[in-house]
UniProtKB/Swiss-Prot annotation:
<keyword id="KW-0256">Endoplasmic reticulum</keyword>
<keyword id="KW-0328">Glycosyltransferase</keyword>
<comment type="similarity">
    <text>Belongs to the ALG10 glucosyltransferase family.</text>
</comment>
<feature type="transmembrane region" description="Helical">
    <location>
        <begin position="9"/>
        <end position="29"/>
    </location>
</feature>
<keyword id="KW-0808">Transferase</keyword>
<feature type="transmembrane region" description="Helical">
    <location>
        <begin position="270"/>
        <end position="290"/>
    </location>
</feature>
<feature type="transmembrane region" description="Helical">
    <location>
        <begin position="533"/>
        <end position="553"/>
    </location>
</feature>
<feature type="transmembrane region" description="Helical">
    <location>
        <begin position="225"/>
        <end position="245"/>
    </location>
</feature>
<keyword id="KW-0812">Transmembrane</keyword>
<dbReference type="GO" id="GO:0006488">
    <property type="term" value="P:dolichol-linked oligosaccharide biosynthetic process"/>
</dbReference>
<feature type="glycosylation site" description="N-linked (GlcNAc...) asparagine">
    <location>
        <position position="265"/>
    </location>
</feature>
<dbReference type="GO" id="GO:0006487">
    <property type="term" value="P:protein N-linked glycosylation"/>
</dbReference>
<protein>
    <recommendedName>
        <fullName>Dol-P-Glc:Glc(2)Man(9)GlcNAc(2)-PP-Dol alpha-1,2-glucosyltransferase</fullName>
        <ecNumber>2.4.1.256</ecNumber>
    </recommendedName>
</protein>
<dbReference type="GO" id="GO:0005789">
    <property type="term" value="C:endoplasmic reticulum membrane"/>
</dbReference>
<keyword id="KW-0325">Glycoprotein</keyword>
<feature type="transmembrane region" description="Helical">
    <location>
        <begin position="112"/>
        <end position="132"/>
    </location>
</feature>
<dbReference type="InterPro" id="IPR016900">
    <property type="entry name" value="Alg10"/>
</dbReference>
């Protein structure tokens, strides 16, 4: 097999180059933002003073003394304007206790809480990407496995380097046959036959695999790290890593909990399931303490882990491509021959949620609402257009990942010859993506019906359920203020006298097509194909549960849903397909990174170089708010 130039001339630790670039750019930008805006800005005027109170109260208190900690916490007056619990402040206090020299009373140090979380986020994302890729590889091998298919029966088939390495690793775990006294001619002893699928499956419990080999297998590739860093470079997410907002802490904890759920459902995990379950419970409680709506994402993580695990008990004859058929297969699995394994999987994934659910019930009973503080400005509403705004946000920032995902589903994706130029390969892949989208919308009566339902649903949503929040209409520091002014206006069509067009209705087809495209990508690239449609439905239900009750439109609210959409819609193809599309996946990733870089340069440039003034009567002088304002998400 031909060896790539990178294999002939390897770069030492090349998988860490994307991380080093990400860290360098992030730290330099953080320093620039702090020098430009050294005082608390916008929501920081609420968060920073509150965090400073907790830091002062616990500065000389040992965290191991629960009684002293509780006494000091109850002495702190909580700001009535804050609508989120004090989880982020607990993280800052914890860092001040653990890290030497850390001062959590200063603005720069408090902002560094999010900076630390942002710098470590690519490692966490890469871990999740690796877990999903491993699950997809095992699921693909299990789907293709047949006892009659062995390596000796497929000598004419090209075997990739990765498959050879898997076979070698598996063969080292097999004991060689021991010759008897009457059969001491080793030439007549046939070696054990191992199929590719068997090599892909986890090693049996108790196998003594060397530690170094296990660590090497867990090491992320250069592409995985580049992908993780690019995902964390998402402009709204990356920007709020430089301010003291709750978004980074919320995102980090939800992803950590998701990674732990993946560990809980891995047969070859290195940590006992009981310990993993306890870690999930603690992480979930802290995630809800940072932002209340994270309870939805905790439920999503538990449900998707359960779905992936119990999907293995669904037989091939019960699987289908629509959620109804898959749901019927799941119900049959719950009461079929494998019902014990089915309910065991449900119990394993539901148990870690019990503590956080108990905490949430106590909180609701004490507070009377999911919102803390100023409840009047955050009333629950039926804001159905939020789903349209989200898919538009996802399409804007995820256009190239979506195209890459769609083109991999098309049968035309691999038609180009190996000698094609880079531009020709990319152009062909875009055509394949468009072809896949067309197939998803008009290829069958069911697809046409789904498109019609999406169009009708979004039209009713934007026509009858559009909400204009007072904060969005009055605060000219946010980009949504300027976008909404264009969105809510009517524009006359010069060629048609007297006719106007409303942008909110004109974008309805875009909303519908984006929803169908992302749903198709989620379903097709689900780890377990037998439950892919159910997984897609589960994701959209969780997203709606978070966004629809929210009357305010903010890109920050879309971050968690988009990160999960980006991670789970990525093509985790078998290794041979990855080798054929290696060039293409780097092209799409480079385009995504370039888009993010351009947006980040513009937004940071506006924040630093384009300040503007508010009148003194419009600022909160009691909170030391300054009249100099800056643009941000």
């Amino acid at each position: 097999m031909a060896t790539s130039s990178s294999d002939r001339w390897p770069i030492p630790l090349k998988q860490h180059i994307p991380t080093l670039i990400f860290i360098t750019v992030t730290v330099l930008t953080s320093n620039l933002v702090s020098r430009t805006q050294p005082t608390a800005y916008l929501d920081e005027i609420f968060h920073i003073p509150q965090a400073q109170q907790f830091c002062s109260a616990l500065s000389s208190t040992s965290l191991f003394s629960a009684q002293q900690v509780w006494r000091q916490l109850t002495s702190v007056r909580y700001d009535a304007q804050l609508t989120t619990p004090p989880g982020m402040y607990a993280i800052s206090v914890g860092m001040a206790k653990v890290l030497p020299g850390w001062e959590c009373k200063d603005v720069v140090w408090l902002r560094s809480t999010n900076l630390v979380l942002l710098l470590t986020l690519p490692v966490l994302v890469a871990r999740i990407l690796g877990q999903i890729e491993e699950q997809a590889r095992i699921a693909s091998a299990a789907e293709d496995y047949s006892p009659s298919k062995t390596i000796t029966q497929n000598l004419g088939k090209e075997i990739t380097r990765h498959e050879i390495e898997m076979l070698q690793a598996k063969a080292k775990l097999q004991l060689p046959p021991t010759p008897s006294a009457s059969h001491d001619d080793l030439a007549h002893i046939e070696p054990p036959t191992i199929s590719i699928a068997q090599a892909a499956l986890p090693a049996p419990t108790g196998s003594a695999a060397p530690l170094l080999r296990a660590l090497k297998q867990r090491e992320a590739s250069a592409y995985t790290m580049a992908l993780a860093c690019t995902i964390c470079f998402l402009p709204p997410l990356w920007f709020f890593g430089f301010l003291y907002y709750t978004d980074l802490a919320s995102t980090w904890l939800v992803l950590a909990m998701l990674s732990l759920y993946n560990d809980l459902n891995t047969s070859n995990a290195h940590v006992a399931p009981t310990i993993t379950g306890l870690l999930i419970a603690l992480t979930s409680i802290l995630a809800v303490a940072v932002r209340q709506t994270n309870i939805v994402w905790i439920g999503f993580a538990a449900a998707q882990a359960t779905l992936s695990r119990v999907g293995k008990h669904v037989s091939h004859t019960q699987q289908g491509s629509d959620p109804v058929t898959q749901a019927i297969g799941m119900v049959k699995g719950a009461f079929g021959d494998n019902k014990k394994g089915w309910w065991t999987a449900v119990a394993i994934n539901a148990a870690p949620m019990v503590p956080v659910l108990a905490v949430c019930v106590l909180f609701l009973r004490w507070n009377g609402s999911i919102v803390l503080g100023e409840k009047a400005a955050h009333q629950v509403a039926l804001h159905l257009p939020q789903m349209g705004y989200f898919v538009a946000f996802a399409l804007g920032f995820g256009l190239f990942p979506l195209l890459f995902s769609l083109q991999s589903m098309s049968h035309k994706a691999q038609d180009q010859g190996p000698s094609s130029s880079t531009l020709a390969t990319f152009t062909h892949s875009v055509r394949s993506a468009v072809s896949a989208l067309i197939d998803s919308t008009i290829a069958s009566p069911g697809c046409i019906l789904a498109l019609a339902a999406a169009l009708a649903g979004f039209y009713i949503a934007v026509d009858r359920f559009t909400i204009e929040h007072a904060y969005m209409l009055a605060d000219n520091r946010h980009y949504t203020f300027y976008i909404w002014r264009k969105y809510r206006s009517s524009y006359a069509i010069p060629a048609l006298d007297g006719m106007t067009i409303e942008p909110k209705l004109a974008v309805v087809p875009l909303f519908a097509l984006a929803l169908i495209a992302w749903s198709r990508a989620l379903t097709h690239h689900a780890v377990n194909k037998r439950t892919g449609a159910l997984f897609s439905l589960l994701f959209w239900m969780a997203t709606a549960a978070v966004l629809v009750p929210t009357p305010l439109i903010e890109p920050r609210y879309f971050l968690m849903a988009y990160l999960l959409l980006r991670i789970y819609s990525h093509p985790y193809a078998p290794c041979e397909k990855q080798e054929k599309s290696a060039q293409l996946k780097w092209i799409y990733l480079a385009l995504e990174a370039a888009t993010y870089a351009a947006v980040n340069v513009i937004t940071v440039g506006l924040f630093v170089n384009r300040p503007f003034q508010w009148p003194s009567h419009a600022v909160d002088v009691s909170r030391n708010e300054h009249t100099t304002m800056r643009f941000l998400w």
